[in-house]
């Protein structure tokens, strides 16, 4: 079929449009007869050899089904041609409402859909963003090494009062108005004093207690405590201290370096490795922060309307990601799949992601950006480095077009951001390492 139909376009406001398509009766009959003959050649009908039943017999048995198939085929072909004819950039899945298809009569259907917005990119010239620079001092490095020593500490039981940074084993029971409450008690509970795992006053109240000692603590739950039954309530915790254990830190020497995988170079090699890891962590975070600042400027300079259908599809995608995360955390994939999630909390994020996708695609198109092979290779190698056989993983990526295209999309986005950065002014701002860590943890 080519052009044997009538179509009209109606703009409904915003990005919404409507196509009305009418296929003439003679085209309906022509398509029906063609389909009927095709079915008759292969139909297996009782008392007839395959393909030997007359079209009249086939029509009697399958006429209604054939007519429905013809309707679907006519929609598929005529809609595609109408979209080309009107030069439409359809976004998302169209909503099709069709009249009943009948032989000898015109076949009419209506298509409601959205189109992609027309984008005229505004340059970011004149905009300014801050790029955070982080200097890691020897003091920062020493603190990190001390933290590593604490991670590898051996805990030794001691016979003295408990103090901050000790690990204690306790029994406790919490009561409200003299009555125990749910999840308010435990036996042989392990706790590091100063970890702030418990509500304010709990860990502090254990400090100074001796092994075998019991004590009652009067503690009020915070007003914003997650459990409404406990928020703002005054409770009594009866605590018995079973054990006090103090950390015995390993010596910072070559043997400790070997425990952390340093086979050559000893303590100096360990310091260099730790510094490199610290630099990588802050660099990755600050680069991402810079990228988001650039993208925020892109959205500010280029306000666009986005198709609602794409937002809804992106909400579906975000919810699917949430379910996958829950499945990994709980190890209950079947329950995670059935989770019913509200859509509104995802709408703002989904809208922003769709806007960025459309705007970045336009940046790539306007500046004729193509994925740089060297950057692509570097990205693939970065992913492969976390596997046991990196070379095998690299070969697999380059033999799998779909997986490689996903990394290619990331590279294109990075190149688009680099293009945008070249248009604006970047001011460097130095911050201490500790401040950078706080930002990462937020």
UniProtKB/Swiss-Prot annotation:
InterPro entries named in the record: PPIase_dom_sf, PPIase_FKBP_dom, Trig_fac, Trigger_fac_C, Trigger_fac_C_sf, Trigger_fac_ribosome-bd_bac, Trigger_fac_ribosome-bd_sf, Trigger_fact/SurA_dom_sf
E.C. designation(s): 5.2.1.8
GO molecular function terms attached to this record: peptidyl-prolyl cis-trans isomerase activity; protein folding chaperone; ribosome binding
GO biological process: 'de novo' cotranslational protein folding; cell division; chaperone-mediated protein folding; protein transport; protein unfolding
Reactions this protein catalyses: [protein]-peptidylproline (omega=180) = [protein]-peptidylproline (omega=0)
Domain of life: Bacteria
Enzyme class: isomerase
Pfam families, per database record: FKBP_C, Trigger_C, Trigger_N
Entry GO terms, CC: cytoplasm
Record has Isomerase as a keyword: yes
Location(s), subcellular: Cytoplasm
Keywords from the named record: Cell cycle, Cell division, Chaperone, Cytoplasm, Isomerase, Rotamase
Positions of the PPIase FKBP-type domain: 165-250
Main subcellular location of this protein, as a coarse class: cytoplasm
Domains: entry comment: Consists of 3 domains; the N-terminus binds the ribosome, the middle domain has PPIase activity, while the C-terminus has intrinsic chaperone activity on its own.
Recorded family membership: Belongs to the FKBP-type PPIase family. Tig subfamily.
Role noted for this protein: Involved in protein export. Acts as a chaperone by maintaining the newly synthesized protein in an open conformation. Functions as a peptidyl-prolyl cis-trans isomerase.
Protein name as catalogued: Trigger factor
């Amino acid at each position: 079929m080519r052009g044997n139909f009538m179509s009209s376009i109606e703009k409904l406001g915003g990005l919404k449009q409507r196509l009305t398509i009418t296929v003439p009766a003679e085209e309906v009959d022509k398509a029906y007869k063609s389909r009927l003959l095709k079915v008759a050649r292969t139909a297996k009908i009782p008392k007839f050899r395959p393909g030997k039943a007359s079209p009249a017999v086939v029509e009697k048995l399958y006429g209604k089904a054939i007519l429905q198939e013809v309707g679907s085929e006519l929609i598929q072909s005529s809609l595609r041609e109408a979209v080309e004819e009107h030069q439409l950039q359809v976004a998302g899945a169209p909503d099709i409402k069709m009249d009943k298809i009948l032989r000898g009569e015109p076949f009419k259907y209506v298509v409601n859909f959205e189109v992609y917005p027309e984008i005229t990119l505004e340059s970011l010239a004149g905009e300014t963003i801050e790029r955070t620079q982080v200097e890691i001092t020897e003091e920062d490095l020493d603190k990190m090494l001390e933290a590593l020593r604490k991670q590898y500490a051996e805990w030794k039981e001691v016979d003295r009062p408990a103090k901050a940074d000790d690990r204690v084993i306790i029994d406790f029971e919490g009561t409200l108005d003299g009555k125990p409450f749910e999840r308010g008690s435990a036996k042989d509970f392990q706790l590091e004093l100063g970890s702030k795992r418990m509500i304010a006053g709990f860990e502090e109240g254990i400090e100074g207690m001796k092994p075998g000692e019991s004590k009652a603590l009067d503690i009020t739950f915070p007003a914003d405590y997650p459990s409404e039954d406990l928020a703002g309530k005054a409770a009594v915790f009866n605590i018995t201290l079973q054990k006090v254990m103090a950390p015995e830190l390993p010596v910072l020497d070559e043997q400790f370096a070997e425990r952390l995988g340093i086979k050559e170079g000893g303590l100096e090699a360990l310091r260099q490795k730790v510094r490199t890891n610290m630099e990588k962590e802050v660099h990755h975070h600050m680069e991402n922060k810079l990228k988001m600042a650039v993208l925020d400027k892109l959205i500010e300079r280029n306000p666009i309307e986005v198709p609602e259908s794409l937002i809804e599809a992106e909400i579906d995608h975000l919810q699917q990601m949430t379910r996958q995360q829950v499945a990994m955390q709980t190890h209950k994939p079947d329950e995670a799949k059935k989770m019913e999630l509200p859509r509104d909390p995802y709408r703002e994020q989904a809208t922003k992601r769709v806007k960025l996708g459309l705007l970045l695609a336009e940046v790539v198109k306007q500046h004729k950006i193509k994925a740089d092979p060297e950057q692509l290779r570097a990205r693939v190698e970065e992913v492969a480095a976390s596997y046991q056989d990196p070379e095998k993983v690299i070969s697999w990526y380059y033999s799998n077009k779909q997986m490689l295209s996903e990394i290619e999309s990331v590279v294109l986005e990075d190149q688009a951001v680099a293009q945008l950065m070249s248009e604006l002014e970047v001011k460097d701002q130095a911050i201490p390492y500790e401040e950078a860590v706080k930002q990462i943890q937020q």
